[in-house]
């Protein structure tokens, strides 16, 4: 799909070897089956549903390339092939994630997200997309205020100043809760004057996205191509992998802006 091609541009080039592995159904079936467990030729034929001749031909070609090897009566994936299969599985997860969240990725500024985090997008595959309508214009802001109210630790990237968020972050600091913020450089002066956040740094204003991480949840908001923040959509997740992804995104972004 076009959107997949577009968003995978920054996911560094996939080798021709990996492309070759994925363009044959019989090859994929055999490799996926061996990825789970070593198998005999008989078991492979039964498990894949392919004909014996098809399995035999595929196995012979894979063995010649060193992708698999035989020990006694069973076939095993080589270590390098196991790594390639894991790469393919990760790519598949990324594509599924892109399709699932197309509404928040399409026509939004996603190029500001560091490549290291783009390459691990599959980790947020279990996230949820919150969308609001005109009749509930403040839904996403209310949600953010709710999670901040329950937070025991906060890391955030703030591209704009919103008084209610600042008030809640100040309240957390008064209660001895750690808050670290990276803010857009065009509002740094406001935070320095109005906020109690001491662990504060800034980034160039053309690198816009909203990220809030607490001990329980991650929240990601993006800007639209017209330069305005999308007030109608947020990606949220309480999944541990997604929270870890968000923490890594925060650190990658901070390191890029030192």
Name these PLM-found stretches:
Residues 15, 101-180:
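PLD-like (HKD) phosphodiesterase/transphosphatidyltransferase domain
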Residues 70-92:
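Basic, amphipathic "hinge/linker" alpha-helix immediately C-terminal to the N-terminal HTH DNA-binding motif
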Residues 40, 126, 132-137, 232-239:
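Intrinsic-disorder/low-complexity, polar/charged segments
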Residues 2-36, 43, 47-70, 89, ...:
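PLD/PLD-like phosphodiesterase catalytic module centered on the HKD motif
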Residues 37-38, 74:
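Residue at a beta-strand N-cap/secondary-structure junction
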